[in-house]
């Protein structure tokens, strides 16, 4: 008797969300099952196809919930299967806006939305109301603020068509009124018009890879502030399959934050090998599939993650004898297209989901790639940050922390060659975000520069770089940081500055660069100063 196991990694916040099953025609015998988590999908355990007749199928799933247990009936075989569900714990994002009004909270136990009503007035947004879906039923929400006499056209969300809310952008008055002035909603399919005025301080409610399932905030005669509850957005899987039962090596990378790089090896007939560099919360994870032949052609495609995502994969198939993937082409959210790897045929396929980016791949292979599928999630809202080009040498591997609201702490490790380690503590929505370690702080002296956030912010970085003994490319030798209030001590070696990273009327809210055994490059991400 064959045994199979599908492991779920709770350390990655992976949760079982559904089970698909296949029953033998004319009986209650379950002949195959397939498990789906919020991150990946298992192979089919057992049989999907029946020898006589088509199997009946069943699904165990409840929107917005996870499976926490099973029940069923069995004798010599498994005859029935049921599941116990509970709500997936949401993430609460604090309310953005002014401090006035009375607190309200719609809660988070919803699957999604059907309609959003918003009414503007002379002083800003007067009124907001959300109609939710709970346990598959329409739930009318409570109004927040004061509704005027004018009729309000709702922003409709087609929950039945798997449409869901992924972000809210708006503006609020920082003066005494503290009222939200304008607001705009974005789903995985469309974006509403801006309701109200584009004035005041801009805010955003969004979380990469998550959807909004509820709101909270403060209101009186107007809407003073708005916050949201998030849960993991559905994972979309698309595949091209030959349907061949002869290829038995199934692989599934699962899903990550995004794709950083793609490597392909190919000859004139087929794609022999693929390798993907994924981003796993700032760390690179490699996955490789197929046969690594050293004598065939090779190519790579680098993605500027987190500012860029692969949005589609175009491929062709060999149709003689076995059907192998003959060519692959990748397109990104920035409108870039990779080289075509392989020799295209007339048999084409496309992996693409509108408004989404690729976060993982799966497929079948042996001596070449036979089937290919991809996991998609909605693209994150475009960042308002601007990237200032990194300075330094070309050594090491690229890293990019992205953009936040500000900088809280800077940690610098240095040795006799220069800067070997950097780490930053950021601020996002008044919460501390711990950046990744870049380099190794083992046996190094690590110094700290702490900013008095939120009143103090970083406006420039000056430094120097040079070739030193033991390094083939230039390394960062010195760094010094300047805020709106003061200048830090010098980190590293006393040398003449050779670069300054800054942009007029902007503050630094993130860092990027290249790191190996030493820091080779450093650059910054900036936002306009609005304070």
Swiss-Prot record:
The keyword Repeat applies. Keywords: Lectin, Repeat. Residues 1-87, 90-232, 235-378, 385-528 form the Jacalin-type lectin domain. GO terms for molecular function: carbohydrate binding. SUPFAM superfamilies: Mannose-binding lectins (SSF51101). Pfam families: Jacalin (PF01419). SMART domains: Jacalin. PROSITE patterns: JACALIN_LECTIN (PS51752). The keyword Secreted does not apply. It comes from the Eukaryota. Belongs to the jacalin lectin family. This is Jacalin-related lectin 16. The gene is JAL16.
């Amino acid at each position: 008797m064959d045994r199979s196991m599908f492991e779920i990694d709770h350390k990655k916040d992976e949760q079982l969300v559904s089970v698909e099953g296949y029953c033998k025609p004319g009986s209650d015998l379950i002949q195959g099952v397939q498990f789906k988590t919020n991150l990946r999908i298992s192979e089919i355990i057992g049989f999907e196809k029946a020898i006589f007749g088509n199997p009946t199928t069943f699904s165990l799933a409840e929107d917005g919930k996870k499976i926490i247990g099973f029940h069923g009936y069995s004798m010599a075989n498994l005859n029935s299967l049921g599941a116990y569900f509970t709500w997936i714990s949401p993430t609460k994002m604090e309310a953005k806006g002014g401090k006035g009004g009375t607190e309200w909270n719609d809660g988070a136990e919803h699957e999604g939305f059907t309609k959003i009503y918003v009414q503007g007035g002379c002083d800003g947004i007067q009124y907001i109301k959300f109609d939710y879906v709970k346990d598959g039923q329409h739930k009318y929400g409570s109004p927040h603020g004061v509704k005027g006499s004018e009729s309000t056209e709702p922003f409709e969300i087609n929950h039945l068509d798997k449409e869901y809310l992924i972000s809210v952008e708006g503006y609020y008055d920082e003066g005494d009124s503290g009222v939200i002035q304008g607001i705009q909603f974005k789903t995985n399919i469309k974006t509403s018009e801006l309701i109200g005025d584009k004035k005041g301080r801009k805010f955003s409610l969004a979380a990469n890879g998550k959807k909004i399932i509820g709101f909270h905030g403060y209101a009186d005669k107007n809407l003073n502030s708005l916050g949201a509850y998030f849960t993991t957005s559905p994972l979309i899987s698309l595949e091209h399959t030959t349907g061949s039962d002869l290829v038995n090596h199934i692989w599934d990378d699962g899903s990550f934050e995004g794709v950083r790089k793609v490597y392909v090896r190919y000859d004139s007939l087929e794609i022999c090998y693929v390798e993907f560099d994924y981003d796993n919360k700032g760390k690179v994870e490699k996955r490789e599939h197929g046969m690594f032949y050293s004598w065939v052609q090779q190519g790579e495609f680098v993605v500027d993650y987190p500012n860029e995502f692969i949005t589609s994969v175009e491929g062709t198939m060999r149709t003689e004898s076995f059907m192998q993937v003959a060519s692959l082409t990748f397109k990104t959210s920035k409108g870039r297209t990779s080289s075509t790897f392989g020799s295209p045929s007339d048999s084409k396929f496309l992996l693409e989901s509108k408004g989404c980016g690729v976060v993982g791949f799966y497929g079948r292979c042996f001596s070449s790639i036979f089937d290919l599928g991809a996991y998609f999630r909605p693209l994150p809202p475009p960042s308002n940050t601007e990237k200032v080009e990194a300075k330094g040498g070309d050594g090491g591997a690229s890293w990019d922390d992205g953009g936040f609201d500000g900088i809280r702490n800077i940690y610098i490790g240095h040795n006799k060659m220069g800067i070997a380690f950097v780490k930053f503590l950021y601020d996002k929505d008044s919460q501390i975000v711990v950046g990744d370690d870049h380099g190794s702080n083992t046996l190094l002296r690590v110094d700290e520069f702490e900013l008095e956030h939120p009143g103090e912010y970083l406006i420039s970085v000056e430094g120097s770089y040079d070739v030193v003994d033991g390094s083939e490319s230039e390394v960062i030798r010195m760094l010094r940081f300047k805020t709106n209030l003061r200048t830090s001590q010098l980190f590293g070696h006393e040398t003449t500055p050779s670069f300054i990273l800054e942009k007029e009327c902007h503050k630094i809210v993130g860092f990027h660069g290249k790191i190996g055994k030493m820091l080779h490059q450093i650059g910054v991400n900036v936002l306009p100063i609005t304070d």
